[in-house]
């Protein structure tokens, strides 16, 4: 039986290795090769013991073959040891990438957090520089970088999340201002209701005018008495009403449009609009009719006119649904005013004159809202929505325009002197349009 050596291509140290996919295929084939070599080694050992029992095999040539076979067996064992060490090293290398990958992810996440904190710190520093009003920034805006810290914990250190933040201050100021405005409007509505109750409680009979009340007797718009020097009759009719429906309509309009106008124009300008609307409406009634009238709804129409101007100039900053709701209420109030004018001493010229006065006066005093930063320069008559916002018109400008309007009315009254002019009546104007 002849002997022959088995040669296998086994990767040794220093040789080129396969990739991961090729390595799996190589390892599966290597098992079969290893089993074949083990079978060959067993067969060689049996053959070696058999050869010792045969005298012929003790010749030098046969001994050389046995030495060669034993040397090849040693080489095979060495290669198997190299394979074992290689597979052990390969297994360790497979576990290391997951650890290194996790470390890389942690480093990237930490770098991203640090970059976000840097950008946030720069933004807060810019806000701090732009803030000019006192008490706008509650605390020093500094972001401390530390390992394992989160953005939320660092923001808590800046003082933004506490109750003294700039946005919280703005909300508190707006709420306090709205409360003050509502109180002012409620006081005016209470005065109207109180005067109406006093009218019902103090009836007076006059020979020329019939049954009147004490407030109507001394405060209604009567042209002859105005020309005689009782100029206050251009002011007092704005607080007089012809009955419960009239005062209810006036109070409802005042409580609906009053807070809006008061918030947009300011409390001082709101009061000037209210007074100017009443005076202008009574003056318009003085020019067009000689009948005694009251004008309690005149100031309400002046507020509607000022509100319309504000909605037109700031339409991009106002919600459409709120505008539509109030516009419908304005139409309803106008319709009820026209109906009530046929059931009492209410002159439609009073409402029309007050509406025109509110529109004209509001056009010159209405603040224009625009978005901008706190560091920008504030222009005259423009409200900046931001850290330096101003929720009212310029009081000096409003008072100056109010003085001009009153001066024009007084001058016109002095120039007329002989009583109302020969203007067409309100019904004539309506019928001519139809």
From Swiss-Prot:
Function (record text): Probable rhomboid-type serine protease that catalyzes intramembrane proteolysis.
Biological process, per Gene Ontology: proteolysis
Family stated for the protein in its record: Belongs to the peptidase S54 family.
Subcellular location: Plastid, Chloroplast membrane
Organism from which the protein derives: Arabidopsis thaliana (Mouse-ear cress)
Any GO MF annotation of the entry: serine-type endopeptidase activity
Membrane topology recorded in Swiss-Prot or TrEMBL: Multi-pass membrane protein
GO cellular component: chloroplast membrane
Record field: transmembrane: 182-202, 209-229, 238-258, 267-287, 289-309, 326-346, 352-372, 399-419
Transit peptide: 1-68
Enzyme class name: hydrolase
Record-linked InterPro entries: Peptidase_S54_rhomboid_dom, Rhomboid-like_sf, Rhomboid_protease_S54
Keywords: Chloroplast, Hydrolase, Membrane, Plastid, Protease, Transit peptide, Transmembrane, Transmembrane helix
Protein name (record): RHOMBOID-like protein 9, chloroplastic
Top-rank lineage group of the source organism: Eukaryota
Enzyme Commission designation: 3.4.21.-
């Amino acid at each position: 039986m002849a002997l022959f050596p088995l040669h296998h291509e086994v990767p040794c140290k220093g040789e080129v290795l396969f990739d991961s996919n090729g390595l799996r295929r190589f390892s599966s084939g290597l098992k079969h090769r290893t089993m074949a070599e083990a079978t060959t080694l067993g067969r060689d050992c049996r053959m070696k013991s058999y050869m010792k029992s045969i005298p012929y095999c003790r010749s030098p040539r046969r001994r050389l073959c046995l030495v060669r076979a034993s040397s090849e067996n040693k080489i095979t064992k060495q290669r198997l040891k190299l394979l074992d060490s290689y597979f052990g090293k390969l297994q360790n290398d497979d576990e290391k990438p997951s650890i290194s990958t996790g470390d890389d992810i942690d480093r990237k996440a930490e770098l991203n957090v640090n970059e976000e904190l840097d950008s946030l710190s720069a933004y807060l520093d810019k806000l701090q520089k732009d803030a000019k009003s006192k008490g706008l920034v509650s605390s020093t805006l500094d972001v401390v970088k530390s390992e394992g810290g989160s953005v939320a914990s660092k923001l808590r250190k800046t003082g933004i999340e506490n109750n003294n933040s700039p946005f919280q201050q703005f909300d508190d100021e707006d709420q306090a201002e709205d409360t003050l405005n509502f109180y002012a409007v409620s006081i005016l509505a209470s005065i109207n209701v109180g005067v109406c109750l006093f009218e019902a409680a103090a009836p007076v009979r006059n020979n020329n005018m019939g049954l009147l009340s004490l407030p109507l007797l001394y405060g209604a718009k009567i042209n002859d008495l105005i020309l005689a020097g009782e100029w206050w009759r251009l002011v007092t009719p704005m607080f007089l009403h012809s009955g419960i429906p009239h005062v209810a309509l006036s109070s409802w309009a005042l409580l609906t449009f009053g807070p809006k106008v008061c918030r947009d124009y300011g409390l001082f300008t709101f009061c000037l609009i209210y007074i100017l609307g009443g005076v202008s409406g009574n003056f318009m009634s003085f020019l067009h009719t000689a009948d005694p009238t009251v004008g309690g709804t005149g100031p309400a129409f002046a507020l509607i006119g000022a509100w319309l101007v504000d909605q037109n100039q700031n339409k991009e900053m106002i919600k459409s649904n709120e505008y539509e709701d109030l516009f419908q209420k304005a139409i309803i109030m106008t319709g009820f005013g026209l109906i009530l004018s046929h059931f009492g001493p209410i002159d439609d010229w009073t409402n029309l004159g007050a509406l025109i006065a509110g529109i004209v006066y509001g056009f010159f005093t209405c603040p224009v809202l625009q978005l901008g930063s706190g560091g920008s320069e504030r222009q005259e008559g423009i409200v900046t929505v931001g850290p330096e916002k101003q929720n009212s018109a310029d009081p000096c400008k409003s008072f100056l325009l109010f003085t001009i309007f009153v001066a024009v009315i007084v001058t016109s009254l002095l120039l007329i002197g002989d009583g109302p002019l020969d203007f067409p009546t309100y019904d004539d104007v309506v019928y001519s349009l139809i």
